[in-house]
Every structure is written in structure tokens, then in C-alpha cells.
């Protein structure tokens, strides 16, 4: 892998590498003023690495695995498991992240509606789908080495310099820099666009405290002291505090999103804009005219058609970037299931079928801590009977946890009812009152059983309170545990660190690092086993941070709220009505209403609400998901194509609407193959399915 050195050494190697010897302004001088030399943006720290891929032995989209390799249940081999190479880790990261965001089953649509072999028209014409091109990788930082936001630009060999385009692929969740490769990167590469990725300053930065081991930008590991400012993340402890913590809490891990103490979410819009600016620099480095040994600027700000695209909180970051962009970096926005925290004006209202919804516009800190508290109990409500089972635990163990959680909720006055059934029914009713759709009833159990909700609740509570790993917020920590008893503090047979870049998602439990409750009945343990009620008092404490108005959490949440003013940019939001991780009443519905209120007739936002759509397409092959729910990926791709036609040929965007899909049905675990009959197109004339706006309100037809 070729590495461009940082600014301090650039002058010494300018001739060899063809780079300007100085950084430019924050926008990389691509604004039509100042020097015409292609200078690195000032926020780039530590130099730029580049690598070219031939599209045969290795490539941008599949890391040489191709369609079949990505579909294989067997991860790609690592040549040296104790010290994987950067190339092996990149391949593993692309494999893991691609599979994490889409349904990889053939019956579920992989290879037919999406996948490396499927072209932009939805046809199986691309074979294994490998894409040749070049990658640029660098950190964005302020010089302290504590931000170290990973930025990655992929430029496919099919890029047409006379028709330039950029698609952003901001990572979803707390994933690494390849986190949105299947959600947005793939479409951009097939379109011949440069793809601008960022990990948002959260991506998979792990610190193994017992050995003081961290990850570098390419996923390889190093001692934290030796790494210094080149570490993706090093916990802010100091040697004395680190030793004391390790003595009391052995075999624990700090993670960047949870423990950076920086509330990284406040920068996600800016990080997305930085990725775009870095992409401009990379395009100029590739296609700018050479003046001696220096590249000239070919593309200035606004010269490149740029679509901000991603899903989940990557989608939220894209919206935040578009709101913050007053200089013309972003042309349009296409996002799926955006996780966003809203500053809701008093005029805004949300209705479904003409009736006011129970609650809307709550921030994640509110609804996630509530769901984490109530979901195990709500899973026993009669309305949730038959929900998909998404846990590796024996069903009897899960049933016991659920009943015990109901009992603890009742004793502590959170739910009412004299028996488990009535307590569970009340827990589900409380979720409905908090804005969760009845369409989500079958998903309350798997969202908790999969540990998605507990993981997010703990990580974000730490982030919002800007807690140190040493704080053990609400007695939670991250650590390796005994596979049978769940006891924490055990030394792992194999450290998770060498492969955390490739396998991890940045939010424990991940890659063998589990969510631990330190105040268990028999000591620290996996939160599900620490107490009979699955660490109820820890969950109760997390909830109390919000309900009691913890000042740190309140300030952090206020710092990340968005206003929905996209400055007239054409935009599309797609979300599933059944979303139970990011409830639609707290995300897309009120955001769309706020946008129409903020922009009035200047608004160019279309919102498509998909029935039978939920947050995790990767779950759709699981029994009970396959029969009930449809893939949002299909509509995300359709939305990107609609936006492209709008930008390039002036085709009008279809108006906001509900898309009524048809579940596959059949037998759980053996649903019939997905077909176009399940997936009606977004309509140019939605008629009675149109979503309407007025006076700050949105009305979504049933």
C-alpha cells in the first residue's frame, strides 16, 4: 500500500508523489479562490494512503471475493490469524459490512434484486461484480490525534472525468469506514461515481485495556503508547489509572463511540462534508492537470454532482450534512431509515389516517433507554406471541428472563398488573404510548433478544454523558466472558483485537467482546445472566439518566438536534413503517413535517413510507422475518435511481407516499422467493396513498 506522508514531510517527496507540499483551506481550495494547486484540506492528518485494485485479484466492492464470495457463509481466510495483514483485514471488513446491511439469501433477493452481479437496471449482467479502481485513505483530525475520523474515497475505473459524480457512504451504526458499502457504496461505484466514506469518528475503535492494544487506521494493532496519535482510539486514562482499572476490572475494553468523551455524534454532519471535500481532493489528484510535479485543481466546489446517501445514523449524518451545507458541496440527499434527533417546533404534528399519533419526535436517548427497559417484558404480551426468535439462548432461558424483567418492572412501579400477562400487556402499551407502532409488536422481542437495543442503549448513554470507560456508567462495561456461565473477567483464549476491524461493528457485543453488568449477583457477568432479570437495575439507571434530566446527557442531545432545513436540496427519505430500532414517529415522519414547515414551497423532499419494512434487512432470512417483512434495500436503490433521473434528466421526484408492500408469507424459515409482486414501485401518482402536509403537520394514510 502506498502512503502519502503528512504535510511536514510533503516537500521532500513532492516530486515522487505528485502532491502539493502544503495543506489548503478547510475546503481544500476547491472553491474557486486562492491557489489552483490541489492542496490537501487542512483537516487531513498524518498523510494519505493509496492503493489501486485491478478488479480481478482484488477490487473496490468485494475485495476480490466477488458475488459468490460475499454470499458464502464462510468468511475469507486470514493468512496469519495472530497478526492479520491490512489486506486481509480490509477483505474481512468488506465481507462483514456488506453482509450486515442486506439480505444475503437468494430467496430474499440477493443476486436477483441487489448484489454485485445486478446492474443499475436490476438485471443480472455483471457476473461476479468486481470493480477496479483506486482507494485513498486518511484521518481527519484537529492535530490532537483524539478525533482521527477515518475518511476513504473509492474512485472506480469507470469514473468519467467529464461527467463527475460523488456518492457519500457514511457508515451506519458505529461501524468502520466500509460500513455502508452495500447500502450506498455499491450503487455509487456501479454508477461510475467516486464514493466518499467516513466512519464518523466512531468506527470500531477498540482499546484492549489489559494489554494496552489499539487499532490503527488500516485495522492492524499496536501498543497504544507506541501508536501515539496514529491510534484510531486510545482511552483517556493514563498509566496509573489504567493499571488501577485493570486490577479491579480485568479484561475490559474501551470503544471509541462509547468512551471517546467527545459526543462524536455532534460532528457527524461535518464528518460527511469532510469526506466529500476529501473526495474532491482525490479526484483532482487523479484527474487534475500536472503542472510540473503538482496537480492542478480541475473540480471546484459545486462542479461535481454529489448525492449524500446512507442508512440509519449514516442517513442521519447525511441529513445533518445537507442542513449544514450552505456552500454547495451537496447536490441532493437520499437516505434510508435515518436516525436523527429533532428540534421540533411547536407547530409540528404527526397523524396517521387523520388521527394524532401517541408521541413523536423523541430523541434516541429517550426512546432507546425506554425500549431497553420494557422490551423483555413486552415480549410476553399476547400481541407479541409468535414473534421471530433471534437469540442463541435456549428459549426457556429467554422466557425466564422475560418473566423476571416483568416482575422487577412491576415491583419498581414501572408497569402495572398482578400477573405476567397483564404486566407484559402494560409494557407493550407503554411502548405504544411512547410512539412505537403496533406494526412493530412482533419486533419488540427480537430487537432486545438480538442485543441490538441493549447495545445501542449502553453505547449512546456513555457517549451522551461523555463518560470514561473507568466510569462504568450504570455498572455496565465491555469485556470477554465465559461462554457457559457468562462470568466476566476471563482472559480470552484468542484476543478479539487482531480481527475487530474486520469483524466488529463498534457496539459491543461484537467479535467476542460482550456487554457486561458489573453488579451481578455473583459478580460481573454478561448482562443477560448477571441477574435473573437481565440486569434490570442497570437498564433502570440508564433510563433514569434521561427521565431525571442528567445535565451531560441533556446538553449532548441538544448539541446533535437537527432542524430539517435542507435549503431546497432535492431529497428522498425511505423508511419502513415497522421500524423498531428507530421508530418512524421519532424520525422520518416528523422530519418531513419539519422540512415542509421550514422550507415551505421551496421544499424538494419526498418521503416514502414502506409498509412491512423494518430496520435490519440482514435479519430477513431469519424464520418469521422472511414471511412478514420486505427489504428496504430494494426501495433505497429505487430512490437512488429516481434521484439520479431527477438530477440528470429533470424527471420529477414522485410525491411523498405510503408504499403498500406484500409480505412473502408461507412457512416461517421457508418463505417463497421474493418477487416483484411483493414490491410495488414507488408511484408517480400515489392517489389515496399520498402523504400530505400542511401547517406544520404530516398526515400519513393507513
PLM-predicted stretches and their roles:
Residues 1-9:
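Bacterial N-terminal signal peptides that target proteins for export
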Residues 17-21:
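C-terminal motif of bacterial Sec signal peptides marking the signal peptidase cleavage site
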Residues 23-26:
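Bacterial signal peptide processing site
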Residues 28-702:
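C-terminal His-loop and adjacent cap/lid subdomain of alpha/beta-hydrolase
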Amino acid at each position: 500500500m502506498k502512503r502519502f506522508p503528512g504535510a511536514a514531510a510533503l516537500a521532500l517527496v513532492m516530486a515522487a508523489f505528485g502532491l502539493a507540499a502544503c495543506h489548503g483551506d478547510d475546503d481544500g481550495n476547491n472553491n474557486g479562490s486562492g491557489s489552483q494547486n490541489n492542496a490537501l484540506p487542512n483537516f487531513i492528518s498524518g498523510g494519505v494512503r493509496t492503493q489501486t485494485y485491478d478488479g480481478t485479484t482484488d477490487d473496490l466492492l468485494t475485495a476480490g471475493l466477488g458475488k459468490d464470495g460475499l454470499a458464502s457463509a464462510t468468511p475469507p481466510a486470514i493468512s496469519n490469524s495472530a497478526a492479520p495483514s491490512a489486506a486481509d483485514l480490509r477483505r474481512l471488513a468488506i465481507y462483514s459490512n456488506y453482509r450486515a446491511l442486506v439480505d444475503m439469501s437468494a430467496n430474499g433477493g440477493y443476486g436477483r434484486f441487489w448484489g454485485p452481479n445486478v446492474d443499475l437496471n436490476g438485471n443480472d449482467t455483471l457476473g461476479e461484480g468486481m470493480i477496479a479502481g483506486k482507494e485513498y485513505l486518511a484521518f481527519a483530525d484537529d492535530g490532537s490525534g483524539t478525533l482521527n475520523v477515518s475518511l476513504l474515497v473509492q474512485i472506480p475505473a469507470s469514473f468519467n472525468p467529464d461527467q463527475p459524480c460523488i456518492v457519500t457512504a457514511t457508515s451506519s451504526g458505529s461501524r468502520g469506514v466500509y460500513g455502508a458499502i452495500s447500502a450506498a457504496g455499491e450503487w455509487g461505484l456501479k454508477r461510475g461515481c467516486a464514493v466518499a466514506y467516513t466512519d464518523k469518528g466512531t468506527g470500531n475503535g477498540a482499546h484492549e485495556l489489559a494489554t494496552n492494544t489499539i487499532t490503527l487506521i488500516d485495522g492492524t494493532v499496536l501498543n497504544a503508547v507506541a501508536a501515539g496519535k496514529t491510534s484510531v482510539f486510545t482511552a483517556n486514562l493514563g498509566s496509573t489509572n489504567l493499571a488501577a482499572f485493570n486490577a479491579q476490572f480485568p479484561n475490559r475494553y474501551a470503544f471509541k463511540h462509547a468512551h471517546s468523551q467527545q459526543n462524536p455524534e455532534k460532528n457527524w454532519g461535518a464528518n460527511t462534508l469532510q469526506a466529500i471535500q476529501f473526495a474532491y481532493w482525490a479526484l483532482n489528484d487523479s484527474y487534475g492537470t500536472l503542472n510540473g510535479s503538482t496537480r492542478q485543481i480541475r473540480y471546484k466546489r459545486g462542479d461535481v454532482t454529489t448525492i449524500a446517501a446512507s442508512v440509519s445514523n449514516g442517513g442521519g449524518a447525511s441529513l445533518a450534512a445537507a442542513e449544514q451545507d450552505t456552500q454547495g458541496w451537496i447536490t441532493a440527499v437520499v437516505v434510508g431509515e435515518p436516525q436523527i434527533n429533532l428540534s421540533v417546533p411547536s407547530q409540528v404534528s404527526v397523524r396517521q389516517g387523520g388521527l394524532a399519533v401517541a408521541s413523536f419526535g423523541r430523541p434516541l436517548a429517550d426512546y432507546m433507554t425506554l425500549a431497553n427497559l420494557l422490551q423483555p417484558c413486552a415480549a410476553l404480551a399476547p400481541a407479541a406471541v409468535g414473534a421471530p426468535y433471534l437469540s442463541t439462548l435456549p428459549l426457556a432461558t429467554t422466557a425466564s428472563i422475560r418473566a423476571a424483567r416483568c416482575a422487577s418492572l412491576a415491583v419498581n412501579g414501572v408497569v402495572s398488573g398482578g400477573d405476567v400477562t397483564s404486566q407484559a400487556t402494560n409494557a407493550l402499551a407503554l411502548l405504544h404510548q411512547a410512539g412505537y407502532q403496533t406494526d412493530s409488536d412482533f419486533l419488540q422481542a427480537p430487537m432486545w433478544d438480538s442485543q441490538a437495543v441493549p447495545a445501542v442503549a449502553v453505547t449512546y448513554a456513555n457517549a451522551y454523558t461523555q463518560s470514561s470507560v473507568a466510569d462504568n456508567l450504570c455498572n455496565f462495561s465491555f469485556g470477554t466472558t465465559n461462554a457457559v456461565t457468562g462470568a466476566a473477567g476471563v482472559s480470552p483464549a484468542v484476543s478479539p483485537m487482531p480481527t475487530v476491524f474486520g469483524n466488529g461493528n463498534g457496539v459491543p457485543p461484537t467479535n467476542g467482546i460482550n456487554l457486561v453488568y458489573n453488579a451481578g449477583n455473583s459478580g460481573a457477568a454478561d448482562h443477560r445472566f448477571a441477574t435473573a432479570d437481565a440486569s434490570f437495575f442497570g437498564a433502570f439507571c440508564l433510563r433514569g439518566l434521561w427521565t431525571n434530566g442528567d445535565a451531560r446527557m441533556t446538553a449532548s442531545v441538544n448539541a446533535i438536534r437537527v432542524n430539517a432545513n435542507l435549503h431546497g436540496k432535492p431529497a428522498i427519505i425511505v423508511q419502513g413503517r415497522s421500524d423498531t430500532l428507530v421508530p418512524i414517529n421519532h424520525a422520518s415522519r416528523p422530519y418531513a413535517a419539519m422540512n415542509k414547515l421550514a422550507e415551505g414551497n421551496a421544499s424538494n423532499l419526498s418521503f416514502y413510507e414502506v409498509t412491512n419494512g423494518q430496520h435490519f434487512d440482514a435479519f430477513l432470512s431469519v424464520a418469521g422475518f422472511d414471511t412478514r417483512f420486505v427489504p428496504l434495500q430494494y426501495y433505497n436503490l429505487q430512490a437512488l435511481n429516481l434521484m439520479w433521473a431527477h438530477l440528470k434528466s429533470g424527471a420529477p421526484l414522485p410525491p411523498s407516499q405510503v408504499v403498500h408492500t406484500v409480505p412473502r408469507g408461507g412457512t416461517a424459515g421457508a418463505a417463497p422467493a421474493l418477487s416483484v409482486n411483493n414490491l410495488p414501485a414507488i408511484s408517480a401518482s400515489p392517489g389515496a396513498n399520498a402523504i400530505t402536509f400542511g401547517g406544520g403537520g404530516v398526515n400519513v394514510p393507513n
